């Protein structure tokens, strides 16, 4: 069930704000509940709702406190480099929908299958989400671990993700659950070097991650990242930005994701990077 459209995250590689808008357009609670009520009439309905979501599932109902300021604002992101003070971060409408959906007699369980912004979360919402609406795996998108690369991506610092990781583990432990975080990562984003990818592999190994939800950067129209990819310049600072463009360079960066496979192919792709991952004595 798509609850809203639009995204104010402003990630430099993403086009959602271009084709859905930066302002969140949310469906009414009544509209959402009417759609869910009709599901019980489907012959294949089993009582499990796979996704109460949107582009970023936890942005439902959010908007500027003073919309006249939003109309004048030229910031590409309401979350980066810091969350805008004018952003209304009210989770009450979203939590209300979760509770009403779960109270419906034909709903056995409702999940959030869409990705969430872990840098936009209250403790109350986080606990509700993790204990009641995760089907075993929760999708999040740190995208990288390098401070400089994350700045170019307009994503929160890696430390913000680590804090959420600890919160996720704590809530699971307290609730007696064994659920997983599924982090999304990107290689070869403008500004990303082999050294940055080595750091990413080391952080993933430290957290016992085996990255699978990964992709190599693909330039898409109307994004800052694509501008940097083709020009090699950050247009905001006019500074040079390293760009991995050749197949060899891109394959090498992508190979760092698969340090855990230890295959000859994955090792060769990253130039024997497994030997460089800290704590890996087997080489």
Per-range role (PLM):
Residues 19-37, 44-50:
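Non-heme iron-sulfur electron-transfer modules
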Residues 121-125, 189-206:
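Catalytic cores of alpha/beta
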Residues 38-182, 186-190:
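Conserved SAM/AdoMet-binding glycine-rich loop
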Residues 29-33, 94, 161, 197:
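Amphipathic alpha-helical segments in well-structured domains
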Residues 195, 205-212, 216-278:
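C-terminal accessory regions of radical SAM enzymes
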Residues 1-30:
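Canonical Radical SAM [4Fe-4S] cluster-binding loop centered on the CxxxCxxC motif
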Residues 17-21, 82-83, 149-150, 184-186, ...:
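Short beta-alpha connecting loops at secondary-structure transitions
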